[in-house]
């Protein structure tokens, strides 16, 4: 996998590689995510988006998007991460590459407030439409009738 990662670093000079316990993590700026994911899917055989999630790091003022990709034919796995500004978390939608990203992006939007430009129907999926806030953010406080 070393040659593979070196090739990606040549194509994406801002790419940071972090060794993981199980698989390497590629950290890429948000504006390069779509190009990297297109490369991984169309030219490198990572044909399956296993999952995506968001992690809140309020102490660092960031939200980290985490994507797990599998190459079913190549029996390989890779992790891609994107650090977002916590006040305005936004990263391109991957629904054009993987239609299954639709529901997972809606969940990250609903629960963490991440916006996905290019998403075909970005709206809440678990919370009511009139719900205020994003309940998986670490600073979220549930408001009850009559106070806290």
From Swiss-Prot:
Coiled coil: none annotated. Pfam families: Complex1_30kDa. It is a peripheral membrane protein. It catalyses: a quinone + NADH + 5 H(+)(in) = a quinol + NAD(+) + 4 H(+)(out). It comes from the Bacteria. GO terms for cellular component: plasma membrane. Its EC number is 7.1.1.-. It is found in: Cell membrane. Keywords: Cell membrane, Membrane, NAD, Quinone, Translocase, Transport. One of its GO terms (molecular function) is NADH:ubiquinone reductase (non-electrogenic) activity. NDH-1 is composed of 14 different subunits. Subunits NuoB, C, D, E, F, and G constitute the peripheral sector of the complex. Belongs to the complex I 30 kDa subunit family. NCBIfam families: NuoC_fam. NDH-1 shuttles electrons from NADH, via FMN and iron-sulfur (Fe-S) centers, to quinones in the respiratory chain. The immediate electron acceptor for the enzyme in this species is believed to be a menaquinone. Couples the redox reaction to proton translocation (for every two electrons transferred, four hydrogen ions are translocated across the cytoplasmic membrane), and thus conserves the redox energy in a proton gradient. This is NADH-quinone oxidoreductase subunit C. It comes from Moorella thermoacetica (strain ATCC 39073 / JCM 9320).
